[in-house]
């Protein structure tokens, strides 16, 4: 058992939404990267409907951190208990609770509690963890509150879709993945990418800033964190700085082989920024138009990238 001092924090917010809606967003951890600004990606490793084990990636004080978390959901009391089973230093232990309480008048009190210890309990390390917990907790509560309070038209704000390209049977799937992985080369390979800066301080964790061109020639700057799984042929990402029309944007590149060839797939999930619709698309524009615009713009660029990945793999076979 740890001998370090236990540090405790509590953050709460009142949400103008039913308690069931708020609890549902907390319970759906796999979609947290779409709901919570700090969260990059969540992999569900195992679950029985109540107990679950999750691998999580999130930003903390400007760094990308990863850990495994065990959670116990209790829909009856609207509480979710969590414990990091493999915390990343300087964290030694991390436990906590999400508590959802129905208030008179139909609003909800959402409380997030953390108990943690720090290796060696050095003041600078304790300060680092406290700042990360405080910053992320505030961002998570604010993001959830903002989304939950628009629950009546949640389905209009959120959209998910995918595009795919079939690759020839003789083209190695590894070359398709290689093209998608080597994003630092994209400015000289992909016409709609005019600038891309990429760092990979930890293997498979890429941080990048990119300028892309739209069909009308306008440039958009985005920043992203990408988590790469080469053995599974997957690259997942979260945009940490999005275009004006998008509140949040997550996605995945995947390369899947079968007996007759390879399919390269691009998946997107987006939360629209409702108050930017008319500013971006013009007076009178609505969410339906915004959905079409985002679907077309993201789909066009993704498909172009997939086609170039296909050509990269197939041309290597021809030239070989």
Positions of predicted regions on the chain:
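A broad, low-specificity signal marking well-ordered, structured residues that form hydrophobic/aromatic
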Residues: 80, 98, 163, 167, ...
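Beta-strand/loop substructures that line and gate deep hydrophobic ligand-binding cavities in soluble
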Residues: 6-8, 56-61, 66-68, 83-138, ...
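Short, tandemly repeated low-complexity microdomains enriched for cysteine and small residues
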Residues: 35, 43-47, 112-113, 121-127, ...
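Glycine-rich portal/gate segments that line the openings of hydrophobic small-molecule binding cavities
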Residues: 2, 30-34, 41-95, 184-188, ...
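Hydrophobic ligand-binding cavity/cleft-lining segments
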Residues: 1-50, 130, 138-202
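N-terminal membrane-insertion helices
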Residues: 133-141, 145, 298-302, 306
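Generic structural detector for well-ordered beta-strands
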Residues: 12-14, 72, 99, 166-168, ...
């Amino acid at each position: 058992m740890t001998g370090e001092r236990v540090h405790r924090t509590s953050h709460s917010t009142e949400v103008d939404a039913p308690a069931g809606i708020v609890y549902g967003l907390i319970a759906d951890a796999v979609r947290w990267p779409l709901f919570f600004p700090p969260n990059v990606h969540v992999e569900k490793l195992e679950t029985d409907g109540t107990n679950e084990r999750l691998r999580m990636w999130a930003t903390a004080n400007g760094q990308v951190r990863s850990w495994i978390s065990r959670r116990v959901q209790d829909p009856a009391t609207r509480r979710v208990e969590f414990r990091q089973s493999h915390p990343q230093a300087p964290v030694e232990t991390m436990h906590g609770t999400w508590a959802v309480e129905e208030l008179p008048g139909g609003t909800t009190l959402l409380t997030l509690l953390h108990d943690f210890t720090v290796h060696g309990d050095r003041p600078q390390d304790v300060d680092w963890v406290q700042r990360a917990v405080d910053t992320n907790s505030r961002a998570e509560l604010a993001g959830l509150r903002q989304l939950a309070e628009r629950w009546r038209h949640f389905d209009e704000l959120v959209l998910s879709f995918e595009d795919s390209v079939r690759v020839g049977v003789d083209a190695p799937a590894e070359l398709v993945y290689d093209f998608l992985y080597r994003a630092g080369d994209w400015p000289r390979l992909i016409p709609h990418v005019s600038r891309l800066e990429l760092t990979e301080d930890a293997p498979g964790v890429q941080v990048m800033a990119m300028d892309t061109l739209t069909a009308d020639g306008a440039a958009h700057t985005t920043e992203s964190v990408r988590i790469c799984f080469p053995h599974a042929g997957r690259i997942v990402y979260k945009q940490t700085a999005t275009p004006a029309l998008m509140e949040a944007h997550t996605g995945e590149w995947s390369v899947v082989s079968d007996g007759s060839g390879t399919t390269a797939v691009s998946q997107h999930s987006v939360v629209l920024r409702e108050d930017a619709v008319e500013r971006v698309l013009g007076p009178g524009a609505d969410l339906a138009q915004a959905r079409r615009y985002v679907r077309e713009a993201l789909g066009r660029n993704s498909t172009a990238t997939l086609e170039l990945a296909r050509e990269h793999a197939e041309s290597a076979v021809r030239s070989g």
